[in-house]
Amino acid sequence: MTDGQGNTVYFSECVIIFTSNLGIYTRAADGGRQQNVTPDMPYPEVQNRVRSAIEEHFKLELGRPEILNRIGENIVVFDFIRPEAARKILRSQVDRIFRDLSAERRIEITISERAYSVLLEHALGNLENGGRGIGNIVGALLIDPLSRFLFDNGIFSDARLEITEIDAQAAPPCLECRRS
């Protein structure tokens, strides 16, 4: 493939990965969309339903079965994020934030079980938004309030804090910290 500036890229030894929600929803009789798969379905059923919907989309809706033929069997259907995976994603994101603050600002942070349970409750509350949804929750309930707390209290480096409480209902969400 050659771009508009004459640069040529050869795809003979490339792997192209794209993600899509194709197959998650189907068209309802009224023209709206209806959910084709749900998080409570076992993965084999999710996989079969999504593959069938993708095939139908390329063959019937687009009228381009040759595109699907070029992709072949190289479609990987990802499962919904299940609660155990969501717990791991949340823990990983929180740990990374605390590790980065420690490395970059020498700010050591711990979080109480009570505060962490608020994050976990919200992360598990809507798994349909996937990993990005968990990241958005971490941003809204932890990163943004923690940033405001640090700035408002003039804490820019060399501190030890414990997050004791997260108030997700406040507008904007806020947290309570104490020096440890």
Model-flagged regions — what are they?
Residues 1-180:
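AAA+ P-loop NTPase nucleotide-binding core of proteostasis motors
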